[in-house]
Each structure stands twice: as C-alpha cells, then as structure tokens.
Amino acid sequence: MAHKKGASSSRNGRESAAQRLGVKRFGGQRVNAGEIIIRQRGTKFHPGDLVGRGRDDTLFALAAGSVQFGTKRGRKTVSIVPQQ
C-alpha cells in the first residue's frame, strides 16, 4: 500500500477562523452612535428605534443611549433609549 496519495489529492482543508458573532452590548448598557450592538448572520434580531442594520445584518446604534431588548410582532428587536 502506498503511503503517498495521488498527485491531485488534498489532506483535508484547514479549520477556518471563528467569525466572532453575537451580542456585543447587552440590555441596559450605554452606547454611543455607531457602536455595534450585535453581529449576526441573518436577522435573528431586528432593528428597533434608533438602531440601524448593516449590509451583513450587523445591528448598530444610530444615537447615544442605552440598549433595550424586546419583541414586536413576534420578532426579537433591539432598540436604543436615548439619554436624557
């Protein structure tokens, strides 16, 4: 039995780097405009008040305030409560 494989063979791909997805700022935490709140694939969380959605579904703050999680029409949402 040969211990070398044929010319066009591979020994499996290497493991890819983690994508570092998830919640970056939790409920009640203060954020500034532009700060990333959640990195996600797809819309597991939907943007609420004063929250924007990036091309890759990242949710970010549009204004300074505190993060608030909730539900609207059966969907999980993330909103910003503006600072007084």
UniProtKB/Swiss-Prot annotation:
Belongs to the bacterial ribosomal protein bL27 family. InterPro entries: Ribosomal_bL27, Ribosomal_bL27_CS. HAMAP family: Ribosomal_bL27 (MF_00539). GO terms for cellular component: cytosolic large ribosomal subunit. The lineage of its organism: Bacteria, Bacillati, Actinomycetota, Actinomycetes, Micromonosporales. One of its GO terms (biological process) is translation. Residues 1-23 are annotated as: Disordered. One of its GO terms (molecular function) is structural constituent of ribosome. Keywords: Ribonucleoprotein, Ribosomal protein. This is Large ribosomal subunit protein bL27.
